[in-house]
Amino acid sequence: MTESERRTVEELQKRLGVLFNDEELLFRALCHSSYANEQKQAGREDVESNEKLEFLGDAVLELFVCEILYRKYPEAEVGDLARVKSAVASEEVLARVSRRLELGKYLFLGKGEEKTGGRERDSILADAFEALLAALYLDQGYQKIKDLFEDEFESYIEKIMKGEILFDYKTALQEIVQREHKTPPEYVLVRTEKNGSEKLFVVEVRVNDETLAVGRGRTKKEAEKDAARKAYEKLVAEKT
């Protein structure tokens, strides 16, 4: 690490109240791929992106959230738990936690990402949080993650259970489809129907030209949401 990079890493440790045994691990968790690529082009072959840590962090997060759900809601149906798990592990919630930590200001971004507002982009913040979880897990152990974030995630889960945070089926579906098929779902308006005097829009949600579900609504947006909900519930049911 350069002196500037080391200072940033030290500042985040103070923010977290955690002293890492391996500061390089935390540094890597903060390195976006755009920064790692720029540094490699400049001859710094040892600078790695946070993508592998993000991969591990995704699994750590899933265990962390599932453990809370299992312990706090023993009577809940598996399908309901899966829905809440997807909501609390969504890009939107993880980005909120990252903003609370002010994680964006500690990230190492390439010049292009910096110019286009990468420090505030939900996807970058969510990915960085997962990478941070992995770094904490490897360096400090699972208990440290519980100490730092259990209360916060329990609060989000409770709000989702109560409907205070609305579940975004389109986002949840996109995350599943992107992860499994490496392509986003496509929403296609196939026709309109008459329901008495009311006009209904009919939308299909497709992945690789295969129809997952059909939704209906008084607006195209409402029909897309209905299709996303049906497709999401179908995919969750297939997994459980």
From Swiss-Prot:
Pfam families: dsrm, Ribonucleas_3_3. SMART domains: DSRM (SM00358), RIBOc (SM00535). Keywords: Cytoplasm, Endonuclease, Hydrolase, Magnesium, Metal-binding, mRNA processing, Nuclease, RNA-binding, rRNA processing, rRNA-binding, tRNA processing. The active site is at D58, E130. Gene3D superfamilies: 3.30.160.20, Ribonuclease III domain. One of its GO terms (molecular function) is metal ion binding. Its cofactor is Mg(2+). Mg(2+) binds at E54, D127, E130. It comes from the Bacteria. One of its GO terms (biological process) is regulation of gene expression. Its EC number is 3.1.26.3. It is found in: Cytoplasm. One of its GO terms (cellular component) is cytoplasm. Residues 9-141 form the RNase III domain. Residues 168-237 form the DRBM domain. InterPro entries: dsRBD_dom, RNase_III, RNase_III_dom, RNase_III_sf. Its main location: cytoplasm. It catalyses: Endonucleolytic cleavage to 5'-phosphomonoester. It is an enzyme of class 3 (hydrolase). Belongs to the ribonuclease III family. Digests double-stranded RNA. Involved in the processing of primary rRNA transcript to yield the immediate precursors to the large and small rRNAs (23S and 16S). Processes some mRNAs, and tRNAs when they are encoded in the rRNA operon. Processes pre-crRNA and tracrRNA of type II CRISPR loci if present in the organism. NCBIfam families: RNaseIII (TIGR02191). Homodimer. This is Ribonuclease 3. It comes from Thermotoga neapolitana (strain ATCC 49049 / DSM 4359 / NBRC 107923 / NS-E). The gene is rnc.
